[in-house]
Amino acid sequence: MKKVLVKAVHCYQRWISPALPPACRYYPTCSNYMIQAIEKHGPDKGLAMGTARILRCHPFCQPGYDLVPEHFSLRRNWAEPEKKEEEDSK
């Protein structure tokens, strides 16, 4: 199931996404987030996390980093990589 979902996202990235204007306000893009979430948390939780991310991505949201969290969560991961690296070096 995991491979089927990842393949579906890859097909979207290859065939559909290039025909649409760039719209994702987060890094990584919503489709890459979906793939990472499925690979890290499995098909059920990954699909739920990816869908929640797509619903969060709209013109009125605050753009920025939204990395896939280590633990399952449907909320935005507000930790930015720069801050995380600073904390790790302490």
Curated annotation (Swiss-Prot):
Pfam families: YidD (PF01809). InterPro entries: Membr_insert_effic_factor_YidD (IPR002696). Keywords: Cell membrane, Membrane. The keyword Electron transport does not apply. It is a peripheral membrane protein. One of its GO terms (cellular component) is plasma membrane. Its main location: membrane. It is found in: Cell membrane. The keyword Membrane applies. HAMAP family: UPF0161_YidD. Could be involved in insertion of integral membrane proteins into the membrane. Belongs to the UPF0161 family. This is Putative membrane protein insertion efficiency factor.
